[in-house]
Amino acid sequence: MSRRQAISTTAMSQDLDQIVADAQAAFAAANDNATLENEKARFLGKTGALTELLKGLGKLDPETRKTEGARINQVKQQVEAALTARRQALADALMNARLSAEAIDVTLPGRAVSRGSLHPVMRTWERVEQIFGSIGFDVADGPEIETDWMNFTALNNPDNHPARSMQDTFYIDGRDSDDKLLLLRTHTSPMQVRYAKMHVEKYAGKAMPPIKVICPGRTYRVDSDATHSPMFNQVEGLWIGEDVSFADLKGVYTDFLRKFFERDDIQVRFRPSYFPFTEPSAEIDMAFGNGKWLEISGSGQVHPNVLRNMGLDPERYIGFAFGSGLERLTMLRYGINDLRLFFEGDVRFLRQFA
């Protein structure tokens, strides 16, 4: 190495030390990313200080070029490390400022989770079960797809009865294992037949206690308007024994209405009517202000043919049955005038009963 090259190398080393010091100071003084990027270009850009020094290596002899090149790369790494550290510091400062601005006061009360509630019809369903359960009635369940025999024939409906037509009943393709027609049940009365038959089998050869059961559930008919739906909920009741009378029917149902509507002054009348499965039969009406009466149930003494289909001797056993729409009871209890509101799922409507 010549004396001139030695002097040049010493000067370059001094320049490198100064570049490191200047870069560290410049980066530390940068208060935002834009300023930091400008300072980066001053030292590491295409025309930056370190880049210019690298260009000058070509004037040195091979041995000196190798030594100084390594030194310049070392300095470059120091400058890049200072740049990275400052970038991280700025990012941390920005995050801390954002967190401070968006800080959550953990002492504030939380937002309550919205709670659901029972559908008004289900409230009625449970209330009916509770009232009848308190006077010794069981609750029975059964299939919604029934046979033509169980839904109609067992209940003394003649073959030419209008209810059997496709205009009133949803029939299902296919038949059961006994080749009987299948349909969506039009009432929950088939559950009464099933329950009674099981009751008779259970107490075969023994003293049989009275049959007291209610049968709530979904039913289906070809009908749809403001007061009718193709699917609706119904509850039917049955009480059969050796000395059950029509007076018992009047007493049980009147007591039920008073408890359901929580009124002791309810006026009820039993109006003669016709149903294939009861004889005598009656519509049950309830008084609603201004001398108006509203039908709320059908009822009557169980027909002897139905008792036979249940496996009971009509000469020994007698009983009564009734059936009420749960939607109708719900509408009367809450003053609702359109049945379709129950099926629309409007949360604004349902919240009124939460």
UniProtKB/Swiss-Prot annotation:
UniProt cofactor note: Binds 2 magnesium ions per tetramer.
Pfam families xrefs: Phe_tRNA-synt_N (PF02912), tRNA-synt_2d (PF01409)
Keyword RNA-binding set for record: no
Subcellular location: Cytoplasm
Residue positions binding Mg(2+): 279
Domain of life assignment: Bacteria
EC number from the UniProt entry: 6.1.1.20
InterPro entries: aa-tRNA-synth_II, aa-tRNA-synth_II/BPL/LPL, Phe-tRNA-synth_IIc_asu, Phe-tRNA_ligase_II_N, Phe_tRNA_ligase_alpha1_bac, Phenylalanyl-tRNA_Synthase, tRNA-bd_arm
The protein's enzyme class: ligase
Keyword annotations from UniProtKB, A to Z: Aminoacyl-tRNA synthetase, ATP-binding, Cytoplasm, Ligase, Magnesium, Metal-binding, Nucleotide-binding, Protein biosynthesis
GO molecular function: ATP binding; magnesium ion binding; phenylalanine-tRNA ligase activity; tRNA binding
GO biological process, one term: phenylalanyl-tRNA aminoacylation
Named cofactor requirement(s): Mg(2+)
Catalytic activity, as annotated: tRNA(Phe) + L-phenylalanine + ATP = L-phenylalanyl-tRNA(Phe) + AMP + diphosphate + H(+)
Presence of the UniProt keyword Cytoplasm in the record: yes
One GO CC term on file: cytoplasm
Main location per the UniProt record: cytoplasm
PANTHER family: PHENYLALANINE--TRNA LIGASE, MITOCHONDRIAL, PHENYLALANYL-TRNA SYNTHETASE
UniProt similarity note: Belongs to the class-II aminoacyl-tRNA synthetase family. Phe-tRNA synthetase alpha subunit type 1 subfamily.
Subunit structure: Tetramer of two alpha and two beta subunits.
Protein name (database record): Phenylalanine--tRNA ligase alpha subunit
Organism for this UniProt entry: Cupriavidus pinatubonensis (strain JMP 134 / LMG 1197)
